[in-house]
């Protein structure tokens, strides 16, 4: 847990957060079965289970490794994506290379709504207005045995030794306001509530049995104004062998067809699953992901966060469903569905509350 506005903070507005840490050198280590090891692909992301933002003791948003990975694949242009790959130790394939990802300092740029200045420069977190609330990051991490892998992805081996990260820190990008502007905004927030448009992420996860064929997944737990849906499949075996952000099956798409329905009416035609990997991103000004990341947008330009340009109010839809069929012989795994929604952070007298609670 890290407090962002404790005594000694340096600025008024937060625009970026980056987690930085060093990992010990494992290039000379062997597993209990005698295999050489390296850290998992995208170790800078994979090491984490969740990163949560709290204001005044209330969770405002939660980041998962999968969602950060999805945004880096779809919302970043090629140059930014390549730089991001270098920061987190990301490679296009999981093929084992004993000379990569065995040590070093890694950086994880978080992707909360105010951290996406490489996509949209309009958002920020006005820390100076939240003087009566604690702003806090809470991180949950995996064990090292979960993020160290070997050449043949054997799942019965273990390291047989204890590893530890070192020199962790949070890099915070602050903006300093002119004293007159700061005073004016503080006085205004004491007189009337200030409203700030934000994004949040919602998640649905369902178990996928082996040879599951097809099934419908209810989306009724999703709420409010949603701009975009993403969904991915992860096999349990790949997760167990340290391939946490691998969404394929036999190097191809594990999904066969997809259809979205609202109240028994077709919201989309039944499409080949690759339509949502290749065509939907093209139509909605997103990058084509290098992985089997499926997306459907209700927005004309989902990267334009500061100006809503198309949403779907899931609170008003009684029976939203997604109908998915899988290719033959897909193993046991999970299907994760993510939704990006709008919300409003209300600030008055130094305290912040959400307009809608998830």
Model region roles, listed by residue range:
Residues 1-358:
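Short, low-complexity Pro/Thr/Gly
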């Amino acid at each position: 847990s890290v407090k962002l506005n404790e005594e000694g903070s340096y600025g008024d507005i937060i625009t970026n957060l980056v987690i930085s840490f060093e990992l010990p050198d494992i290039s000379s280590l062997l597993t209990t079965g005698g295999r050489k090891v390296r850290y998992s692909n995208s170790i800078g992301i994979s090491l984490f289970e969740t990163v949560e933002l709290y204001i005044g003791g209330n969770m405002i948003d939660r980041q998962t490794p999968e969602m950060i990975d999805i945004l880096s694949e779809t919302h970043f242009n090629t140059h930014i994506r390549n730089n991001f790959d270098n920061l987190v130790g990301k490679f296009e394939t999981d093929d084992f290379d004993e000379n990569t990802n065995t040590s070093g300092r890694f950086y994880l740029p978080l992707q909360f709504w105010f951290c996406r200045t490489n996509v949209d420069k309009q958002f920020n977190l006005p820390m100076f207005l939240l003087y009566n609330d604690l702003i806090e990051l809470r991180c949950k991490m995996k064990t090292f045995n979960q993020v160290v892998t070997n050449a043949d992805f054997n799942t019965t081996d273990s390291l047989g030794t204890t590893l530890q990260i070192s020199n962790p820190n949070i890099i915070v990008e602050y903006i300093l306001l002119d004293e007159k502007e700061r005073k004016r905004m503080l006085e205004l927030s004491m007189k009337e509530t200030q409203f700030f448009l934000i994004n949040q992420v919602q998640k649905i996860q369902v178990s996928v049995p082996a040879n599951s064929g097809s099934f419908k997944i209810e989306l009724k737990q999703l709420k409010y104004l949603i701009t975009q849906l993403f969904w991915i499949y992860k096999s349990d075996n790949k997760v167990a062998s340290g391939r946490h952000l691998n969404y394929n099956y036999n190097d191809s798409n594990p999904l066969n067809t997809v259809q979205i329905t609202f109240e028994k009416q077709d919201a989309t035609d039944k499409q080949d699953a690759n339509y949502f990997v290749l065509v939907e991103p093209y139509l909605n000004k997103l990058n084509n992901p290098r992985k089997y990341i499926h997306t459907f947008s209700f927005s004309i330009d989902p990267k334009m966060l500061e100006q809503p340009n198309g949403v779907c109010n899931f609170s008003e839809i009684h029976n939203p469903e997604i109908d998915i069929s899988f290719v033959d012989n897909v193993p046991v795994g999970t299907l994760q569905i993510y939704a990006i929604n709008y919300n409003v952070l209300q600030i008055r007298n130094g305290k912040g509350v959400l307009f809608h609670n998830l």
